[in-house]
A protein has these predicted regions:
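Conserved ABC transporter NBD signature motif
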Residues: 57-65
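Helix-to-loop junction immediately C-terminal to a conserved catalytic motif
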Residues: 49
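A short, proline-enriched helix->beta-strand linker immediately N-terminal to the Walker B motif
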Residues: 153-157
Length: 307
């Protein structure tokens, strides 16, 4: 499903971010990606989301060749992805319900499908009682649950979680990973980037270790930790797997009609999409176009640093 073949990335300023990376991730896998700051994790994610293109090598995701992809195809490719950010990226003047519904509205879902799907997903993440609350009325853990619900709501084939536990307490961190694992049990591919090594040791999953832009370890967890001889500097060691405090919410299919997906000629209006794309105080919807005139909201965000 996801193939990196001899992928290297060198930025315009000469920074070498990735060097000859070869990774294959099958459909339905749950993979942790770990590494110190500057190891190449952010570049790895940007390449998967087609925010960047490789300097050399090929990246294939679901038969899309990302390096050769035309810009107009990017929005349709990104509909296969559900993104969970460390900093939540919630829209402050929208309720929990509307933040989650917004992700469906952007891709053209029908309102009757939204009314069925959104409450179901909000219930999965345990926030039904907070559906009408605003982000500033939620704890950090609750905000991250909203971000997770937003990533789930469009039934993405691939969930990419970028440090999803970075701003929450240990108990909530465990619950977030459990939610991702329950989702993974339904066949969704999950890739979680994290520096929370203690958390990784609790699960028997594949771990990819990046260091200096290279893959230095890639394998299944052994006895609760990846092979120590391959990543001893990360202090990943065997630890008894805990099963306490596991949430039991099952990801079962809710009775609903299949949402109608818009054809390419029905892509959302570019001006509207640019108005909601932001790197700072609102979350980025991974839909864009190559022809657009900035709206007032987009102009207000002008000058923000790229992620």
């Amino acid at each position: 499903m996801i193939d990196f073949k001899n992928v290297s990335k060198v930025y315009d300023n000469g920074t070498k971010a990735l060097s000859n990376v070869n990774i294959h991730i099958d459909k339905g896998e749950f993979v942790f990606v770990v590494g110190a700051s500057g190891a190449g994790k952010s570049t790895f994610l940007k390449l998967m989301m087609r925010e960047e293109v490789p300097s050399s090598g090929t990246i294939t995701i679901k038969d899309y060749n990302l390096g050769e992809m035309k810009k107009r195809k990017i929005p349709y490719f990104r509909r296969n992805l559900g993104i969970v950010f460390q900093d939540f990226r919630l829209i402050p003047n929208m309720t929990v319900y509307d933040n989650v519904a917004f992700a469906m509205r952007v891709v053209g879902a029908r309102e009757k499908d939204i009314r069925k799907r959104v409450p179901y997903v909000i219930n999965i993440v345990g926030l039904s009682h907070k559906a009408r609350n605003y982000p500033n009325e939620l704890s950090g853990g609750e905000q991250q649950r909203v971000a997770l619900a937003r990533a789930l709501v469009n039934n993405a084939d691939i969930i990419i979680a970028d440090e999803p536990t970075g701003n929450v307490d240990p108990q909530m961190s465990l619950e977030i990973v459990e939610l991702l694992k329950r989702l993974n049990e339904t066949g969704t591919t999950v890739i979680m980037v994290t520096h929370a090594h203690d958390l990784v040791r609790m699960f028997d999953n594949r771990v990819i270790v990046l260091d200096g832009g290279e893959v230095i370890a890639d394998g299944a967890v052994e006895d609760g930790g990846i092979p120590v001889q391959q990543a001893s500097h990360l202090n990943i060691e065997a630890k008894e797997k805990t099963s306490e405090n596991r949430i039991t919410q099952k990801f079962v299919s809710a009775p609903q009609e299949e949402p109608e997906q818009p054809q390419e000629e029905d892509a959302p209006d570019a001006d509207f999409l640019n108005a909601i794309i932001s790197d700072t105080d609102t979350y980025r919807i991974y839909v864009e176009d190559d022809t657009s005139a900035p709206s007032a909201a987009a102009e207000n965000k002008e000058g923000g640093d790229a992620e």
